[in-house]
Amino acid sequence: MPLTVAVQMDPLEQINISGDSTFALMLSAQARGHALYHYLADALTWQDGRLYAGANRVSVQPTAGDHFRLGDFAIIDLGRDVDVVLMRQDPPFDLGYITATHLLERIKGETLVVNDPEAVRNAPEKIWVLDFARFMPPTMLTRSLGAAREFAARHGEVVIKPLHGNAGKAVFKVGRDGANLAPLIELFNATYREPHVLQAFLPEVADGDKRIVLVDGEVAGAINRRRAKGDIRSNLAAGGTAEASELTETEREICAALGPELKRRGLLFVGIDVIGGQWLTEINVTSPTGIVAIDKFNGTDTAGRIWDAIEAKIEQRRAA
């Protein structure tokens, strides 16, 4: 079933193909005979009741530095000319990102958008996770220094990070003496308009944090990410390293609790982060990563599994 696929993502020349999940999805789509278009989110245009994008046909190959070829440029109608849109631009989850979800939501009745744009907009990664607070470490969202001091006094060492941050950027640890808490709150308040996330520091992070990928609500695989020496962050984008990992009983319980809701919302490709085998910290729905490392260690084909799910959904839509 050849499909026409439009990939909304960052510039192709900027990606690191050795670990980029979007690139893996494009390679898999191409191998299945699907036609690929590439465009940037700022190429979206709404006019006369239709959503368009200025896009290029593209082919990809797993050769570093020579990994893509752009073909003809065209203005494509995302509701009529393509079968599926992959919404894969990286955060920040700002008004530009939110606006793109509003525009893509307008073609949902015509074209499958992965992940569902309305669901992405309504599930900020560090806010929606609060619906599953029973699995989370102690967490506070605040801009108040007084509230932050009370939280730190209660929990000792804490971590502070931006509410809509990504890839481990601007994540800080505050020691038991709290000496750097006030300047960090001051800096965050000057930099961000939203509340900030404070969480009790989990010593188990020394053993890494686990990225678990779910495809259409089902576990597809997991890796453990170990932090670089002298860093508190385990993100691969921040210098962490991946290793093979199995799920604990609690992690399976977390996935079982999440799965039906992910499926109901149309969140087909999701990555969750778990520390210490039991503490859920984030639910990543905007542009999840990790499938390349998962497949490397587990001998799986997660990109293929994602395309199986996409193709099944398109068949269902066509049969309806």
Predicted regions located by residue number:
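ATP-dependent carboxylate activation and anion-phosphoryl transfer catalytic cores
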Residues: 3, 15-18, 228-232, 243-320
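Short hydrophobic beta-strand segments
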Residues: 4-9, 114, 158
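Redox-cofactor binding/interface segments in oxidoreductases and associated redox assembly factors
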Residues: 7, 86-87, 199
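Flexible loop residues that form catalytic
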Residues: 10, 90, 163, 288
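Conserved N-proximal alpha/beta basic substrate-recognition cap immediately N-terminal to
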Residues: 13-141
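Phosphate-binding site of ATP-dependent enzymes
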Residues: 22, 145-146, 153-157, 164-254, ...
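Short, surface-exposed charged micro-motifs
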Residues: 43, 211, 271-273
